[in-house]
């Protein structure tokens, strides 16, 4: 029998991403822990006290020991591809980061748009069979982000490490047929910046360290407002970046060039729509009755939307693409890298959410397929 009292315990909120996993407790403002979505397996015996307690390492710990580890990334382009490592990552987050017992608290977990049925059911099986959670809910990442903005209807432009997507949402439910995806996101921008730096002759060994290039990207890269502004943007953004080894990089046109791939993915040889046209394309696939509402509530989500100038550039291009006179509003929360997690924290704090849980009793009676019936 299900101990219903456990459903009253604060839920554990997971936001699983290709680059980062965020975890915390329902009702809190931001995640307690944010770790890199990486699991490291020793190449040989590592003389470490910590190696006695576990045979793998996760997050920053794994990255710091990368010379002696085989690094695995369990989530690729938003989808789980290595289930054994994903289970290890969840176990570490439960036990070592949060210090909670999985069988004592319900679990709310975000999932990518258009998540395959097999992935949803596998997640459900692991949570109930391996971790014995009392209840589970899988929520579309974009729905969580919109909830964090206190809205139930709108369009979410979400861009993280592995994928960028536009998701129209009506009264709390995503509209799958109108979702548009672009496989250009944070990691692609980092890789593009690395290539540009190498082409300029920066061959310092440490420059190949992804963390260093990520830091350059996050601190110095911007989005220009268009080709006419590019030269001014390059001049304005001329800057130096000091590498860990003491050398410096003179940054100039890289700053405006790199995030441009979100608007013109052709720069990477990818012949898909850029984010401005993606927004319009998704909205135009929806019923005409709600299109104006969607244009009036566009929400940015994910760390890759944090580039200075991105919101202004997007608005400028949408004003050209949309019908003349269409009211357009873009919401860009300063905490939008945590939007989906925050939305989950808000949703699970509502007294009405209790009826939404897929309980252990539901799983026992109907199997993993029950997640298709209760989480949509």
Swiss-Prot record:
Keyword Transport among UniProt keywords: no
Lineage: Eukaryota, Metazoa, Chordata, Craniata, Vertebrata
Gene: Actrt1
Key words of the record: Cytoplasm, Cytoplasmic vesicle, Cytoskeleton, Nucleus, Transcription, Transcription regulation
Molecular function terms from GO: chromatin binding
UniProt keyword GTP-binding present: no
Record function comment: Negatively regulates the Hedgehog (SHH) signaling. Binds to the promoter of the SHH signaling mediator, GLI1, and inhibits its expression.
Family to which the UniProt record says this protein belongs: Belongs to the actin family.
Superkingdom, taxonomy of origin: Eukaryota
Protein name: Actin-related protein T1
Family annotation (SUPFAM superfamilies): Actin-like ATPase domain (SSF53067)
GO biological process: negative regulation of DNA-templated transcription; regulation of DNA-templated transcription; regulation of smoothened signaling pathway
Any single GO CC term annotated in Swiss-Prot or TrEMBL for this entry: acrosomal vesicle
Intracellular or extracellular location(s): Cytoplasm, Cytoskeleton; Cytoplasm; Nucleus; Cytoplasmic vesicle, Secretory vesicle, Acrosome
PANTHER family in UniProt: ACTIN
């Amino acid at each position: 029998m299900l101990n219903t009292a456990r459903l009253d315990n604060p839920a554990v909120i997971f936001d699983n991403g290709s680059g980062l996993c965020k975890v915390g407790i329902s009702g809190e403002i931001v995640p307690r822990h944010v770790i890199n979505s990486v699991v490291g397996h020793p190449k040989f015996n590592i003389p470490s006290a910590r190696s006695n307690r576990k045979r793998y390492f996760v997050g920053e710990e794994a990255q710091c020991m990368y010379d002696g580890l085989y690094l695995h990334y369990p989530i690729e382009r938003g989808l789980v591809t290595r289930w054994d490592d994903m289970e290890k990552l969840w176990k570490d987050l439960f036990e070592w980061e949060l210090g909670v017992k999985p069988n004592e608290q319900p679990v709310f977990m975000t999932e990518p748009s258009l998540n395959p049925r097999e992935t949803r059911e596998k997640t459900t099986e692991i949570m109930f069979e391996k971790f014995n959670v009392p209840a589970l809910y899988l929520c579309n990442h974009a729905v969580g982000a919109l909830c964090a903005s206190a809205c139930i209807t709108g369009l979410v432009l979400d861009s993280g490490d592995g994928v960028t997507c536009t998701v129209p949402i009506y009264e709390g439910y995503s509209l799958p047929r109108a979702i548009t995806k672009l496989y250009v996101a944070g990691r692609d921008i980092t890789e593009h910046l690395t290539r540009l730096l190498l082409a300029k002759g920066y061959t310092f060994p440490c420059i190949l360290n992804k963390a260093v290039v990520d830091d350059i990207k996050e601190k110095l890269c911007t989005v220009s407002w268009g080709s006419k502004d590019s030269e001014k943007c390059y001049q304005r953004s001329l800057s130096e970046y000091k590498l860990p080894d003491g050398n410096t990089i003179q940054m100039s046109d890289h700053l405006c060039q790199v995030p441009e791939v979100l608007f013109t993915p052709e720069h990477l040889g990818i012949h898909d729509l850029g984010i401005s046209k993606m927004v319009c394309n998704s909205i135009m696939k929806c019923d005409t009755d709600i299109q104006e509402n969607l244009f009036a509530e566009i929400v940015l989500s994910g760390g890759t939307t944090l580039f200075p100038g991105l919101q202004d550039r997007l608005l400028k291009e949408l004003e050209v693409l949309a019908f003349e006179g269409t009211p357009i509003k873009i919401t860009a929360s300063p905490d939008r890298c945590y939007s989906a997690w925050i939305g989950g924290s808000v949703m699970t704090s509502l007294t009405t959410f209790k009826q939404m849980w897929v309980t252990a009793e539901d799983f026992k009676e109907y199997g993993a397929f029950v997640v298709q019936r209760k989480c949509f």
